[in-house]
Amino acid sequence: MDNDLAARRAALGWSQAELAARLGVSRQTVISIERGRYDPSLPLAFRIAEVFGCRIEDVFRP
């Protein structure tokens, strides 16, 4: 799934490890989502949107 997770994370100055800690997942999970190799579960997608203060559809595109 296409996403702008890396750009949003970078805009806030967060490392992959910091975002992972905020989400309660591993750094490898963040890397996999950013590279489009892993589609997050719906609950994780909601957490990602919440951390960035936006809607799921603002971060992820089908």
Regions found by a protein language model. Give the residues of each.
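Alpha-helical residues within the helix-turn-helix
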Residues: A10, A21, E50
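A short, Lys/Arg-rich alpha-helix, primarily the initiator
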Residues: M1-A11
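DNA major-groove recognition helix of helix-turn-helix/homeodomain DNA-binding modules
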Residues: G24, P43-D58
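Short alpha-helical DNA-recognition segment
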Residues: W14-S32
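Phosphate-coordinating loops and pocket residues in cytosolic domains that bind phosphorylated ligands
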Residues: R61
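Short, conserved catalytic or interaction motifs in soluble domains
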Residues: R35
